[in-house]
Design a protein with these regions (language model features):
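Polytopic transmembrane helical bundles with strong interfacial aromatic enrichment
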Residues: 2-345
Length: 345
């Protein structure tokens, strides 16, 4: 059948496609973790060539030692994500009837290709590490967001949610969630800039306060306005849990870095001494050991999961709630705020 504005509507969602999208999202989380371990262990320069590794696609066990383990594992998992994303895009292109979803899947594939190329450039131009590593991190998180979106768009709950209800009270939830997504993305960039030596701790720490306030406001507003709607409150509750964990991990990572042997550490420079915005990388200093590595890697992963959760809440808010202009029109026209609106597929 045809949906609003002539959009083709498939009444039966493809469960296999949905679960495969979730699988690709899971692989991406593993890839993000592998990348975090590469950064924390200063392993990015351990393999000097790209796309090959020591001139080979598969390295020998003799080479799979020390920091090479982290960098090569990162590349191997990235290859798996690339193949899986290609399969997902191909599957969606031939089975998904919504053109915009097909194009989004294609964008995901192009994104993972671009990410691989930027990673290769980073290997061949180590002197420009901060300049290249920060967009590399941003594209990684953005790619993850696109995959999560594809999983949402192919879910049963997305298809079942056909009526839009009013969003009474305060700033529209659509606006709040969109603002939260943007804030989290900016904060992830600031975190990447700090980890890769492109800036000091001050922007990331200040951003953490602002982002925490915005995301908490969004989650609490959702729980207050839509307490009986599981479609919205489930991601909102999870968001509060992740936000608490993220702040806790951030504080613990800060304290662990301050007390690490060899502080200040390589790859980030004397940030805590100067609180400067200028990159002051000290490549000859000692990389911190546990628990510093685990805390920073966990902080990155929980940040990615926070982005995914707020993105899910945002998409669901756009799916389930009327936009502000519809609410205003109903009030000015004497209509009732209880009247539903059909959601486009």
């Amino acid at each position: 059948m045809k949906g609003q504005k002539g959009i083709e509507v498939t009444e039966r969602p493809n469960a296999g496609l949905h679960w495969f999208a979730i699988f690709v999202a899971f692989l991406t989380v593993v890839l993000l973790l592998a990348g975090a371990l590469v950064t924390s262990n200063e392993a990015g320069d351990s393999v000097p060539d790209w796309p090959l590794s020591f001139g080979r696609w598969l390295i020998s066990s003799d080479n799979f030692i020390a920091n090479v383990r982290y960098e090569y594992s990162h590349r191997f998992i990235a290859g798996m994500v690339g193949v899986a994303t290609f399969a997902l895009a191909l599957w969606m292109w031939f089975s998904e009837r919504r053109a915009w979803v097909r194009w989004l899947a294609l964008i995901a594939f192009l994104g993972v290709v671009l990410q691989a190329v930027i990673g290769g450039v980073r290997v061949h131009f180590p002197a420009y590490k901060p300049l290249i590593a920060v967009p590399h991190a941003l594209i990684a998180q953005s790619f993850f967001g696109v995959i999560v979106s594809l999983a949402v768009f192919t879910s049963k709950s997305w298809w079942r949610q056909r009526d839009r209800k009013p969003d009474a009270g305060g700033l529209p939830l659509r606006t709040l969630t969109t603002l939260s997504v943007a804030a989290v993305l900016v904060q992830l960039v600031l975190g990447a800039a700090f980890r890769h030596g492109a800036s000091g701790i001050t922007p990331h720490a200040a951003g953490a306060v602002i982002v925490t306030a915005i995301v908490a406001w969004t989650a609490i507003a959702t729980l207050r306005r839509h307490s009986g709607d599981a479609y919205l409150i489930r991601p909102a509750k999870l968001l509060l849990v992740l936000l608490t964990a993220q702040v806790s991990l951030g504080v613990m990572a800060y304290l662990a870095r301050m007390s690490s042997a060899g502080y200040p550490v390589s790859g980030v420079g004397e940030f805590f001494d100067s609180m400067s915005l200028a990159p002051l990388a000290q490549p000859n200093q000692v990389q911190p050991l546990e628990p510093m590595i685990s805390l920073t890697a966990g902080h990155l992963i929980v940040g990615a999961l926070t982005l995914a959760t707020i993105l899910v809440l945002t998409l669901r808010a756009y799916r389930a709630l009327q936009p502000g202009r519809e609410r205003a029109a109903e009030v000015s026209g004497g209509g009732t705020l209880a009247s539903p609106r059909k959601a486009a597929i």
